[in-house]
Design a protein with these regions (language model features):
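Non-catalytic DNA-recognition/assembly elements of restriction-modification systems
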Residues: 1-22, 27-28, 143, 148-193
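Sequence-specific dsDNA recognition surfaces
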Residues: 4-21, 37-66
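Short, surface-exposed loop/turn microsegments at beta-strand edges and helix-strand junctions
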Residues: 22-30, 49-50, 62-64, 82-94
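Short hydrophobic-aromatic micro-motifs
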Residues: 31-34, 64, 69-72
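A structural connector/turn signal
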Residues: 58-59, 86, 131
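A short beta-sheet element
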Residues: 73-113
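A short glycine-rich beta-alpha junction/loop motif
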Residues: 90-95, 130-155
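Glycine- and charge-enriched low-complexity intrinsically disordered segments
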Residues: 107-129
């Protein structure tokens, strides 16, 4: 089965293309998700600190929905992640492809996990074009071969992957705190000599 076979009516499309630099407006009503907002090896983004703009009559399709999958198609790293919550209206910049799936066929969390696995990543590596900034064509993404188990299995895989990602974030924080603690102790040793 191909990705194209599990899409919702809206399918796959590029995020919003701004004609000029995005100027953050703290009073803005719409968040703009950009590459700089992605953290922890593409595991999530910080909703509260993304740039905001005034609603400039964005088309409805550009507003992210819970369950959308965002895919980075430009550059060396091509990762996907699923939107699991939205605290306010957010659009994605043109750096991302927005993928809307038919949840009766495939779960968005499973699709994001699958697109980040070695088999899919190898497929994307083979399809990349461009020398300065490699990128993927929309059709190559649509033609991604998928393994689509039953929804119950997809859910189990997605939940396990989510727990693994949470563990990775926690372990990274522990490492960071431990490093800071040891550095502080070492500085204290030389200051007390």
């Amino acid at each position: 089965m191909l990705l194209n076979n599990v899409l919702a009516k809206e399918g796959l499309f590029s995020g919003y293309s701004f004609r000029e630099k995005i100027d953050h407006n703290p009073e803005g009503t719409v968040g703009v998700l950009q590459m700089k907002d992605i953290a922890n090896n593409y595991l999530h983004f910080d909703y509260q600190n993304i740039d905001k703009v005034n609603d400039i009559s964005f088309k409805e399709k550009f507003f992210l929905n819970k369950g959308d999958v965002l895919f980075v198609s430009k550059g060396v790293n091509n990762y996907a992640f699923s939107i699991d919550k939205l605290d306010f209206p957010i659009i994605a910049s043109a750096t991302f492809f927005i993928i809307r799936v038919n949840e009766n066929k495939i779960l968005s969390e499973y699709l994001a996990w699958y697109m980040n696995q070695t088999e899919a990543q190898n497929y994307f590596s083979e399809k990349k074009a461009g020398t300065y900034v490699p990128n993927l064509k929309k059709q190559d993404i649509l033609d991604l071969p998928l393994i689509v188990p039953p929804l119950k299995t997809q859910n189990a895989i997605a939940q396990t992957a989510k727990l693994l990602n949470q563990e990775i974030i926690i372990l990274d924080k522990i490492k960071e705190n431990r490093k800071e603690l040891i550095q502080t102790q070492l500085i204290n040793i030389i200051n007390n000599d």
